[in-house]
């Protein structure tokens, strides 16, 4: 067994989701808050485009490894429309979902030992992708007192002569935090000042609520353009997690290197999925607006219910579809004869006792928290959090 591959952990979020689905298939009334996956079907016009593509013989064959030219052009146009960032189709690589985009982006720019500053809490895939690419993730931790947002001062304290990249994610998975325009600009200017690469994940760009606003970092800080990599995809915006279409936007030399890698790893993304993605990014955002309205309603319900639990504090997320409550005050307390000492143990207790699946903060680099997705039906959401409320109300010193 390769030591490098053997050291990689499985996706904790997918593991929790798989366990919940297995229990449900066995007849258990499990409610799963583990998956970051919209509960809506993919819009019909996207599905119909895929059906037509299935019948078109030209999509039965190999196509360019870097993506269908028409999809790359549409992604460039969509990027200008949605964020104001102007790029050429030659700066786009179409990938098998956002995970491949992230790995290939890091692989294209990292040499062994290069450091990547990773704000925590972070999505589980980031540090593992960095390690696979030969880099070293360096955590910079923010907590609920700052809304899980790191400061320039924290980033500067983590910077060394080996630092090559800073990761920037807004809206965030797992916390739902969104950086203000001023704070995002300050981080971008700091990165530009020190000649760092920035990898920014914009997968949740359309899922922001209230007064929060999505802003694309290279638009705020044009000086970053030559050292900025954007990863994005159709999964979250268009309820297309299973279609597996993401993309990288980067300087052309990065795209060429990443495309070469992909040509040997997977070749082109499924043509049918690419045609579906073309319909998605070329269409209007009406379906997205409806989904966002539902997520916003669920967000408010979940946060209110979580904050009614003694020992739980949940900042209000401003984007994505996750709540990230602190449960540190509950650790060590007795609950149904057990004293969970970690959020891993507490999450296991919640699943065992009330059949609700949540993801522990250890998966995101910050023990003492739980991540709950509110991308599920309203009734299931209320029932699931109610079960958690009743269980945790039994906590005693």
Curated annotation (Swiss-Prot):
Pfam families linked: Aminotran_1_2
Binding site for L-aspartate: 36, 123, 173, 371
Record-level Gene Ontology MF annotations: L-aspartate:2-oxoglutarate aminotransferase activity; pyridoxal phosphate binding
Keywords of this entry: Aminotransferase, Cytoplasm, Pyridoxal phosphate, Transferase
Entry cofactors: pyridoxal 5'-phosphate
Taxonomic superkingdom: Bacteria
Keyword Transcription regulation: no
InterPro entries named among the record's database cross-references: Aminotransferase_I/II_large, AspAT/PAT-like, NHTrfase_class1_PyrdxlP-BS, PyrdxlP-dep_Trfase, PyrdxlP-dep_Trfase_major, PyrdxlP-dep_Trfase_small
Residue stretches spanning the membrane: none
Protein name: Aspartate aminotransferase
Gene: aspC
């Amino acid at each position: 067994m390769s030591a490098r591959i053997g050291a990689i952990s499985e996706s904790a979020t997918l593991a929790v989701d798989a366990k919940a689905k297995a229990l449900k298939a066995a007849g258990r009334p499990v409610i799963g808050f583990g998956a970051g996956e919209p509960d809506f079907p993919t819009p019909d016009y996207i599905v119909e485009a895929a059906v037509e593509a299935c019948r078109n013989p030209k999509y039965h064959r190999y196509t360019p490894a870097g993506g269908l030219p028409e999809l790359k052009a549409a992604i460039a146009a969509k990027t200008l429309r949605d964020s104001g960032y102007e790029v050429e189709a030659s700066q786009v690589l179409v990938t098998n979902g956002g995970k491949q985009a992230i790995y290939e982006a890091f692989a294209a720019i990292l040499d062994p030992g290069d450091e990547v500053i990773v704000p925590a809490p972070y999505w589980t895939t980031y540090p593992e992708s960095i390690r696979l690419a030969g880099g070293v993730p360096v955590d910079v931790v923010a907590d609920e007192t700052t809304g899980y947002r790191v400061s320039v001062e924290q980033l500067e304290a983590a910077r060394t002569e080996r630092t090559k990249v800073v990761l920037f994610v807004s809206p965030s998975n797992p916390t739902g935090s969104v950086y203000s325009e001023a704070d995002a600009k300050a981080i971008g200017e700091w990165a530009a000042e020190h000649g760092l690469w920035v990898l920014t994940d914009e997968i949740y760009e359309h899922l922001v609520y209230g007064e929060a606003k999505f802003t694309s970092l290279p638009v705020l800080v044009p000086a970053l353009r030559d050292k900025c990599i954007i990863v994005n995809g159709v999964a979250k915006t268009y309820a297309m997690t299973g279609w597996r279409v993401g993309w990288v936007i980067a300087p052309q030399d990065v795209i060429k290197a990443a495309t070469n890698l992909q040509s040997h790893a997977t070749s082109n993304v499924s043509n049918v999925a690419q045609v579906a993605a073309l319909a998605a990014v070329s269409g209007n955002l009406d379906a997205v607006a409806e989904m966002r309205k539902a997520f916003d309603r669920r967000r408010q319900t979940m946060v209110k219910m979580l904050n009614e639990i003694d020992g739980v504090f949940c900042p209000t997320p401003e984007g994505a579809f996750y709540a990230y409550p602190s449960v540190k005050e509950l650790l060590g307390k007795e609950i149904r004869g057990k004293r969970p000492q970690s959020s891993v143990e507490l999450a296991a207790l919640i699943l065992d006792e009330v059949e609700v699946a949540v993801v522990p903060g250890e998966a995101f680099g910050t023990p003492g928290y739980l991540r709950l997705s509110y991308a599920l039906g309203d009734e299931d959401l209320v029932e699931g959090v109610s079960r958690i409320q009743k269980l945790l109300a039994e906590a005693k010193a």
